[in-house]
């Protein structure tokens, strides 16, 4: 004689079956590792760390703190110090692979796309982007403590870059503001002043509130001098008073 299962037994079996399926699926997901294969083209950006937002101060630069391209070329700001000029170097394929493995091992690829504390105003957003052959992973963090993200950012900015040299872009920018008398360092030497555009161009840039372009070589020389000074920007005397000049790789559009 066949026995009949009661309603309670059927429900219990269904729950057990679903639990077993969920366990198998979860186990499979945990075992699957992210493929770290990437395009080795020198134009392809593989890893990027970028900070944006914050109070609208004129010396905030829009350039990313770290970029690694497919051919191993790296452009970074040493130690993340915003006052230091950018440098560039190159990682071997093995070193690039090790960096990606470090990022993966932090749990970065399991993070959500965004973490934000909306209670804080005028904060900064940090973004890490990793472009691999199997897809792009981008995580943005706004004023929150996300351990995996912070660890990944630490690996990126702390990764040793051998034989680095000055990063010289094709062009740079100067943000010019009219200013009142203020504490300043010693006047810039004549060789630095000589790198600046004519006074009339500086005044026009200040009136238009638009950055003025200069050569990459001039930008780097100006930045190197400014980084040794106590105050941000170069104060330049003009007939109508003075202007403060802020050198930038990429002006921030607000």
Question: Can you say where each PLM-predicted feature lies in the sequence?
Answer:
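Bacterial N-terminal signal peptides that target proteins for export
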Residues: 2-15
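Bacterial N-terminal signal peptides
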Residues: 14-23
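Short, well-ordered, aromatic-rich surface patches in folded extracellular/luminal domains
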Residues: 27-56, 110-254
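Extracytoplasmic/periplasmic, Sec-exported soluble proteins
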Residues: 60, 87-94, 120, 144, ...
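Short beta-strand segments
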Residues: 64-66, 87-89, 135-141
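A short, structured loop/turn motif at beta-sheet edges
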Residues: 70-71, 93-96, 130-136
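A short-motif feature that recognizes glycine-rich, charge-decorated loops
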Residues: 76-110
